């Protein structure tokens, strides 16, 4: 099976070129390093204002750089122009036979697009004014045995862009910039929280119970203990244990795993941040969330007004605040502020064609279904939707004025959820009853219900201070701030269906 690989004509030509190099004792794969003294970006910035004459009269030292060949064009039989890329920039090379020698020039003419080369030379400008390196030495550092896609067409198949991200990164500078922006956003967020005195921590990925969110878990088997365990669906319960333990501000940025669908907004493994701050409430987190979005945006964009899917969003304005029940009333006219029985709520659902599962037969669940069906998609500007029903918020503190609802909010922008936050439930007796209600829901078909976590209950019984907690989807935040249409555009290696 391993010997059945088939190669295109162009791939065979490249392999024959490599074979010849090996026979000539010039195997590029045996090169162990190439000590650069600068980068292409630094060269472009340093010499951008130098004229052709300035460079001719300049007492220059050799520049030593490296990059991938992206363009090759001959200028007669004894010279050629080549464009190379490195991580952050590109530059033109001017290669002449009389400067690098007969044998080196002959080797050079056998280089292919995609090959990685090392270069030594001095800076110049062409007659057309293009900044270039006049090469004194050109060395093949790695041979590309596969050709690159056509430079104008690129990768036409969107699936191939995601499957072969390495090729996408080679041919598309903008894709590289998106992932550099992602890293900058995460670093900015870490620095912002560190400067506030919060501590970054790491908690387990393998959990013996499912909890901390309403989601379907991945299950794996732990051989040594001969038991099934879950890949975490949230970091919440471990982080709150740390608040019990005496830390007053903790956060974790890490991978979360949910055994659910894939779409432009969902990937089964994704990155989130969860933050817990003692002695604060959800209103504190509303203000902090606005700060987070603004400081992360400033790290990658020069304007507080961003554009996403052709809609302009002003992140400098205060985010709106909307109670879930008020939003439903505004859009549908249905008033869930009124006390009502489950039967009355079911009749309203039937009238408005809202589907209700068996485990959702409660007023709180039906309120949430109305919100998701009619209100969520109408939200454009950044809006904190708060006041979620108790039934769908098993870890949030009940609102003291109306215990049907909780002190919880979600941040929505353009119909998408970006954050979920609570004034955290710290009453162990209430938490125990909420877990029992979750078990009851599971028996009625809710496969996203939380398990009973007695250890967490016991932690709360040691007293957790009033605490505010929030989760923010890093991938969606990056999508928003880089104007990326799909979550796959901000994940280096998104989950893909197996090839047929």
Curated annotation (Swiss-Prot):
Residues annotated for Mg(2+) 1 binding in this entry: 410, 417
Quick one: signal sequence residues? none
Q: What is this protein called?
A: Lysine--tRNA ligase
In the record, what lineage is assigned to the organism producing the protein? Answer: Bacteria, Bacillati, Mycoplasmatota, Mollicutes, Mycoplasmataceae
Origin organism of this chain?
Answer: Mycoplasma mycoides subsp. mycoides SC (strain CCUG 32753 / NCTC 10114 / PG1)
List, in alphabetical order, the Gene Ontology terms for molecular function in this entry.
ATP binding; lysine-tRNA ligase activity; magnesium ion binding; tRNA binding
Q: What class of enzyme is it?
A: ligase
Gene3D superfamilies per the record?
A: Bira Bifunctional Protein, Domain 2, Nucleic acid-binding proteins
Cite the InterPro entries for this sequence.
Aa-tRNA-synt_II (IPR004364), aa-tRNA-synth_II (IPR006195), aa-tRNA-synth_II/BPL/LPL (IPR045864), Lys-tRNA-ligase_II (IPR002313), Lys-tRNA-ligase_II_N (IPR044136), Lys-tRNA-synth_II_C (IPR018149), NA-bd_OB-fold (IPR012340), NA-bd_OB_tRNA (IPR004365)
